[in-house]
Amino acid sequence: MMPRLQQHKIILRQLGLQPYAPVSQAMHNFTEFRTDTSADEIWLVEHQHVFTQGQAGKAEHVLMPGDIPVIQSDRGGQVTYHGPGQQVMYIMIDLKRAKLGVRQLVTAIENTVIGTLAHLGIESQARPDAPGVYVGQQKICSLGLRIRRGCSFHGLALNVAMDLEPFLRINPCGYAGMQMTQISALKAGTTMADVQPILVREFTRQLGYPDAEQQPWSLADYLPPDAQSPGNKQCEV
């Protein structure tokens, strides 16, 4: 667990079910236009069905996408799937201000998920050869980050209660035959609402933040400054 970040708060925004592209653009805009005084943010979101290709993604790992769109992403890693019932958490932290290294952040994210699952009675672990969190040999959480101007964005995708079939259409994270699992298969009846507060609490504990301050989310708040009307707020929060 990191030293407590006394001087900086973190804002929590709940987005609900959203298409991938506009949320991704909003996240990029926030990162591009944030200032030294902008609070760090975490966004909880479920995405409509989409495959995303990371920067290292290879076309041969997209086997048969069918009617699910494939979108290029600038996060690290290979191809993965997002869909309803999967908890995505975008993590936008000023690493320079927090005096936090990228490896430290990755470890904190993995430990966040491991702690969340432990709270639900599920034993899991990280693997040095393949980022993410695993239950036995099955992957339950993917992660991918990008750092720009010393600030992180993108984050984690935790399988909670979803249709896992689309993972069969790809080589998840570039691994042929990688088996996926989810919380509801290991603890029946677990819902997104059960998981969200535990996940947020574990994350703030790992990074040493005070409790997250929940604020509403609106796409209009994350337009570039020159595209905002005078009545809209700036990207800085």
Swiss-Prot record:
> Where is the site labelled Lowers pKa of active site Cys?
139
- Cite the annotated pathway: Protein modification; protein lipoylation via endogenous pathway; protein N(6)-(lipoyl)lysine from octanoyl-[acyl-carrier-protein]: step 1/2
Q: Where is the active site?
A: 173 (acyl-thioester intermediate)
Q: Which GO terms describe its molecular function?
A: lipoyl(octanoyl) transferase activity
Q: Which PROSITE patterns match?
A: BPL_LPL_CATALYTIC, LIPB
Q: What Pfam families has UniProt attached to this entry?
A: LplA-B_cat (PF21948)
Question: Which spans of this chain does the record mark as coiled coil?
Answer: none
Tell me its EC number(s), please: 2.3.1.181
Q: Which reaction does it catalyse?
A: octanoyl-[ACP] + L-lysyl-[protein] = N(6)-octanoyl-L-lysyl-[protein] + holo-[ACP] + H(+)
- What's a single GO BP term from this record? protein modification process
User: Where is this protein found?
Assistant: Cytoplasm
Principal localisation: cytoplasm
Look up the record and report any one GO term of the cellular component aspect: cytoplasm
Carries keyword Cytoplasm? yes
**Record: residues binding substrate:** 75-82, 142-144, 155-157
Tell me the keywords, alphabetical order. Answer: Acyltransferase, Cytoplasm, Transferase
Where does the BPL/LPL catalytic domain lie? 36-211
Listed SUPFAM superfamilies: Class II aaRS and biotin synthetases
Is-annotated flag, keyword Hydrolase? no
Q: What function does the entry list?
A: Catalyzes the transfer of endogenously produced octanoic acid from octanoyl-acyl-carrier-protein onto the lipoyl domains of lipoate-dependent enzymes. Lipoyl-ACP can also act as a substrate although octanoyl-ACP is likely to be the physiological substrate.
Similarity-based family? Belongs to the LipB family.
Other facts: In the reaction, the free carboxyl group of octanoic acid is attached via an amide linkage to the epsilon-amino group of a specific lysine residue of lipoyl domains of lipoate-dependent enzymes.
Protein name from the UniProt record: Octanoyltransferase
Name the species this protein comes from: Yersinia enterocolitica serotype O:8 / biotype 1B (strain NCTC 13174 / 8081)
Q: What is the lineage of its organism?
A: Bacteria, Pseudomonadati, Pseudomonadota, Gammaproteobacteria, Enterobacterales
The gene behind this protein is lipB
